[in-house]
From Swiss-Prot:
It comes from Arabidopsis thaliana. One of its GO terms (molecular function) is receptor serine/threonine kinase binding. Residues 1-26 form the signal peptide. Coiled coil: none annotated. Keywords: Developmental protein, Differentiation, Glycoprotein, Hydroxylation, Secreted, Signal. Belongs to the CLV3/ESR signal peptide family. This is CLAVATA3/ESR (CLE)-related protein 14. The modification Hydroxyproline is found at P71, P74. InterPro entries: CLE14-like. GO terms for biological process: cell-cell signaling involved in cell fate commitment; cellular response to phosphate starvation; maintenance of root meristem identity; phloem development; regulation of cell differentiation; regulation of leaf senescence; regulation of reactive oxygen species metabolic process. Glycans are attached at P74. GO terms for cellular component: apoplast.
Length: 80
């Protein structure tokens, strides 16, 4: 019976300590962002940054890929 009373008193003391810690930190909350502020932070500005294109290079503006030169002649990998 003595062990039960010691455990019970320890449990009650721990509950009071944890409740005190919780109530003391409840007043310190970080300021939350409003939904408008969060949307503005996460929104996309709509601008695309494309690389500079010179007149001598062929460039596909839709896909943003350059037309590279393909080697002409027989492919040595297929000549086995």
């Amino acid at each position: 019976m003595k062990v039960w009373s010691q455990r019970l008193s320890f449990l009650i003391v721990m509950i009071f300590i944890l409740a005190g810690l919780h109530s003391s930190s409840a007043g310190r909350k970080l300021p939350s962002m409003t939904t408008t502020e969060e949307f503005q932070r996460l929104s996309f500005d709509g601008k695309r940054i494309l690389s500079e294109v010179t007149a001598d290079k062929k460039y596909d503006r839709i896909y943003g890929a350059s037309a590279r030169l393909v080697p002409k002649g027989p492919n040595p990998l297929h000549n086995k």
